């Protein structure tokens, strides 16, 4: 696990400046900071370098010469800094946005907490982290409309959108490729590589199906069964999906390590306060804070039996998963009719969609075969 975070700035006149640290007592020797500075100077570009200093490893993310800020993560000797690169790039943007305010030190603890669990994030959390980034969400929305965009155009567009901020386009695209959402390819007749949308993400609330099927079997007293089912039904009769609602759940619950531990437990059963207190060993130090976050996002309800025992129940679960964007075919057809996209780019987009479709069919067949084999055993 990481042990600390240091924010450094390089000033040509005064040299190294430490702008913030978490925990506050964390210190990196100036000699080591100069070594990091030299390594970044050697590459000359924004990005990450790693350095071993005594008994620790350091992963340093540099924003480039314009802002000259270094976000340095302190790791144990056994940890590999490369697994934190995408997470470092994401929190670096948020740190730069708060450099000129008094809020820098107050945002470091939650950013450090999220970064610390980055290597262990589940698939749904990784999708959530992507959507929680305004930059990645903006690019995804544009790709949904245009199907393909050149890398050079993305770079220019991002610089125009975030003139005062920092966007590492290469890192941004690498993260989306890793999640299987986009592919990058060259197209005959075009000088810049194109970024193609190959998968999309669906996000919405869903009823906790397994809990509803048999609440009693999931540790809810029989006397509370009807009340629980009625609560879930009432919520979804009025539920209207919205981006604001999705982002609130992602930010307050899905990407909060303590809240996510509680969600995982509540997906399995109805719980009491004692059940939640047992999660302290998994990092749930403040049960009241977690319950407040889940109550405010309308994900839970509390029921009381005739002995005044309280049961905390999941009334709304959250679905976030990739899906094949069939709507892209209509987009491609429309762009061909209006000649708003290069014909070779549209043909490449169709080829990629075809490849993605058959790849998914193959995966589904393999999964079905494996299921049959397990059932036969």
What are the roles of these predicted feature ranges?
Residues 2-3, 10-131:
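Acidic, low-complexity cytosolic segments
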Residues 122-162, 221-283, 339-354, 361-364:
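Short amphipathic alpha-helical interface segments
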Residues 139-140, 146-149, 160-165, 169-172, ...:
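Intrinsically disordered, low-complexity acidic regions
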Residues 162-178, 281-297:
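Short amphipathic alpha-helical interaction segments
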Residues 177-188, 295-307:
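A short, conserved structural fragment
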Residues 189-198, 307-315:
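Minor-groove-contacting beta-hairpin "wing" of winged helix-turn-helix DNA-binding domains
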Residues 197-235, 243-246, 313-352:
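Short, amphipathic alpha-helical interaction segments positioned at domain boundaries
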Residues 245-254, 269, 285-290, 296, ...:
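Long compositionally biased, domain-poor regions of proteins
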């Amino acid at each position: 696990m990481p042990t600390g975070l240091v924010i450094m700035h390089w000033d040509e006149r005064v040299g190294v400046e430490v702008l913030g640290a978490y925990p506050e007592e964390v210190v990196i020797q100036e000699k080591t900071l100069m070594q990091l500075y030299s390594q970044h100077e050697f590459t000359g570009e924004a990005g990450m370098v790693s350095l071993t200093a005594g008994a620790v490893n350091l992963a340093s993310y540099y924003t480039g010469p314009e802002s000259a800020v270094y976000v340095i993560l302190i790791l144990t000797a056994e940890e590999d800094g490369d697994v934190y690169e995408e997470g470092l790039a994401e929190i670096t943007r948020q740190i730069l946005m708060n450099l000129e305010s008094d809020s820098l030190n107050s945002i470091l603890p939650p950013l450090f907490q999220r970064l610390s669990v980055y290597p262990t994030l589940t698939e749904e959390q990784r999708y959530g982290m992507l959507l929680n980034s305004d930059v990645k969400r903006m690019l995804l929305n544009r790709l949904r409309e245009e199907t393909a965009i050149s890398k050079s155009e993305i770079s220019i567009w991002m610089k125009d959108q975030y003139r005062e901020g920092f966007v590492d386009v290469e890192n941004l695209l690498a993260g989306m490729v890793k999640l299987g959402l986009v592919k990058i390819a060259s197209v005959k007749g075009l000088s810049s590589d194109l970024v193609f949308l190959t998968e999309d993400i669906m996000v919405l609330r869903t009823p906790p199906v397994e809990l509803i099927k048999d609440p009693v079997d999931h540790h809810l007293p029989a006397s509370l069964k009807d009340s629980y089912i009625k609560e879930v039904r009432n919520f979804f009769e009025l539920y209207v999906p919205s981006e604001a609602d999705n982002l609130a759940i992602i930010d307050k619950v899905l990407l909060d390590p303590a809240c996510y531990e509680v969600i995982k437990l509540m997906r399995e059963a109805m719980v009491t306060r004692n059940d939640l207190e047992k999660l302290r060993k998994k990092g749930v130090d403040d049960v009241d804070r977690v319950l407040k976050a889940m109550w405010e996002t309308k994900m839970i309800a509390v029921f009381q039996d005739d002995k005044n025992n309280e049961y905390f129940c999941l009334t709304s679960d959250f679905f976030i998963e990739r899906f094949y964007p069939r709507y892209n075919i209509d987009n491609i057809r429309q762009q061909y009719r209006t000649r708003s996209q290069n014909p070779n780019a549209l043909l490449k987009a169709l080829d990629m969609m075809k490849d993605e479709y058959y790849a998914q069919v193959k995966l589904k067949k393999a999964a079905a075969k494996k299921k049959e084999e397990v059932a036969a055993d």
